[in-house]
Amino acid sequence: MNQNREVRTRFAPSPSGFLHVGGARTALFNYLYAKSQGGKFILRIEDTDQNRSTEDSFKIILESLKWLGVRWDEGPEIGGEYGPYIQSQRLDIYKEYTEKLLKEKKAYRCFCTQEELEAKKKQAEAMGVPYVYDGLHANMSDEEVEEKLKQKIPYSIRFKTPSKTLIVDDIIQGKVKFETKLIGDFIIVKSDGFPSYNYAVVVDDALMKITHVIRGVGHLSNTPRQILLYEALDYEIPEFAHASEIVGMDGKKLSKRAGATSILAFRDLGYLPETFRNYMALLGWTSSDGREFLPEGELEKIFDVHRCSKSPSTFDVFKKPKGGEDEVVTNFSDLTQIAEAMNPKSKLNWLSNRTIRDLKISKVLESLLPFLKDRKDIPEEVKNINSPALTSIIESIRVYLDNLAQAPDYIAEFFVTDLKIQSQEATGFMKDGDGPKVVKEFYGILKNSDPKTDENYKDLMSKVGEVTGQKGKTLYMPIRVATTGKSVGLELPILFPLLGKEKLLQRIEKTAKEAGIPLST
C-alpha cells in the first residue's frame, strides 16, 4: 500500500439491531486510528439485507455512535465525496461492476435452486467433507445462458474463484494462509438482485478509497474472498487488522445475548461516554506506557492499531455465571436485570469512578440532571445545574460514585422530610447492646458542639467512642441509623456537614422516638 496516502477507515454496520459491544469496539478502533493518523473516518450503512434492515435500527446506530463520541467525516446526514453511503442506494454501482466481471468471465450466472444446493450440502455432510460449490454452471456457453434467461429461471451470480494460495499479512493476527480451493465459487449477487456482503464491501471500500479495514477476528475468514475480488477488479488491496475475540468473565466467547447489549443501556445506567470509550479502547489495545485511565481527547492522539493484541479480551462488565448457568441476565433489554448482573469490581466501574472524580463539576452536573428528572424525593429547585446545594453534594459524594445513576439515592438522603427507620435490622443497631447509649451520647455531644467540617464530625464521633467504649461498627451503625434511618449509605463525615447540626438533631429526635430511646437522662 502507498504509505503516503491519507488514512481512511470505515465502520459499516447493518441496521438490523442495536449497536452492541463488538460493533462499538470496531467503530471506535476505526475512528481512533483515523484520528491518530490525521485521516478520515467513514460511516457506511450496509442495508442490503432488506428483510432485516429497519429505519429504527438505523436511527439507534447513529444515536449510539454520537453518544460514544465517534464522529464520522463522511457518511449519512453529512454526505461526502464518495457517496451515497447507504448500500441500498448504490445498486446501480454494483450492477456496473457485476457486468464488468461477467464480461471478463470472472463471474457467471448460477441457476441452481436452493433445494439443489441444500442437497449438495447434505451430501457433503454425509461424506464428512466441507461443502464447496462444484461450479456446475461455471462453463455454460453464452447461448445456454441466454436460453435460461429467456425462460426467466431465477439465478444468482458467482465469482469464479482461481485456485491459489493466499497469504494475508494481518496487522494484528500476523500472516494467515488460505487455500482458495476450499472456498469455491461464491455468490456475489443474490437472486433478489442485491449484492452479497463480501462483494458490496469490496466495491464500496475500493471506491471510497479505504486504506485500512479494522474489524473483529470473526471476519478473518471473509478476507480471502475480498482479496480475490480486489484483484479481479484491479483495485489496490487495503491493509487488514482483525481485532481479538471478546470473552466474558468465564473466559468463554461473549454470549450473543450479553454481547448484543446495546451500548445505550450503559448510557441509561449512568456511565459517561468518556468512560465507556476509554473502557472499549482497552478491549484488545494497550497504550505504549501502560496507562489505562486516559484523559478526554488523548485516545485520538495515541491510538495505534499496531499495538492491538491478538489474545482474547475480557469484557468484565458482567459477573461470572454461576455453575450450570449460561447467562447472568435473562433479558438484556431490562435495565434492572443488567444493573443487578454487573460486576462491581469491573474495570469499567474503576474507570467510571476516576472519570467522575476528575471531570469538571459542570460537566458532571449536566450529565446527572436526566437522572434527577423523575425523582419526587429531590426538590425541584435542586434539579438545576446552577443549584449551590446540588453542586456541594456532588462535590462531596462523587468520589463514591461508580456511575451517575447511583447519585440520586445519595442526593435524596439530604432532603428526607419524614425520616423513618427503614428495616428491623436498622432498628436493632439503635436498640440492641450499647446502641441506645451511643445514640444518646452522640446527641448530647452534638447539641453542645458547633461542628462545621468533616474533621469536626470525625473528632465528635471519636469523643463518643471514648465515652461509650465503642468503636467500629458498634459505634458508627447506631449513629448512621439515628441520622439516616438506614444501615448503609455515604460516609457520615461527608454527610453530616452538608446536613448541618440542626437537621441532624431533628433526625435523631425522630428516630430515637420511633425506636423508643429516651434522649434525656
From Swiss-Prot:
GO molecular function, one term: ATP binding
Primary location group: cytoplasm
Sorted UniProt keywords: Aminoacyl-tRNA synthetase, ATP-binding, Cytoplasm, Ligase, Nucleotide-binding, Protein biosynthesis
Catalysis: reaction(s): tRNA(Glu) + L-glutamate + ATP = L-glutamyl-tRNA(Glu) + AMP + diphosphate
Subcellular location, record wording: Cytoplasm
Any single GO CC term annotated in Swiss-Prot or TrEMBL for this entry: cytosol
Subunit structure: Monomer.
Protein name as catalogued: Glutamate--tRNA ligase
Region forming the signal peptide: none
Its EC number(s): 6.1.1.17
Binding positions (ATP): 256
Gene behind this protein: gltX
Motif 'KMSKS' region, chain ranges: 253-257
Domain of life where this protein originates: Bacteria
Family listed: Belongs to the class-I aminoacyl-tRNA synthetase family. Glutamate--tRNA ligase type 1 subfamily.
Origin organism lineage: Bacteria, Pseudomonadati, Spirochaetota, Spirochaetia, Leptospirales
Role summary: Catalyzes the attachment of glutamate to tRNA(Glu) in a two-step reaction: glutamate is first activated by ATP to form Glu-AMP and then transferred to the acceptor end of tRNA(Glu).
An example Gene Ontology biological process: glutamyl-tRNA aminoacylation
Species of the source: Leptospira borgpetersenii serovar Hardjo-bovis (strain JB197)
Chain location of the short sequence motif 'HIGH' region per the record: 13-23
InterPro entries: aa-tRNA-synth_I_cd-bd, aa-tRNA-synth_I_codon-bd_sub2, aa-tRNA-synth_I_CS, aa_tRNA-synth_I_cd-bd_sf, Glu-tRNA-ligase_bac/mito, Glu/Gln-tRNA-synth, Glu/Gln-tRNA-synth_Ib_cat-dom, GluQ/Sye
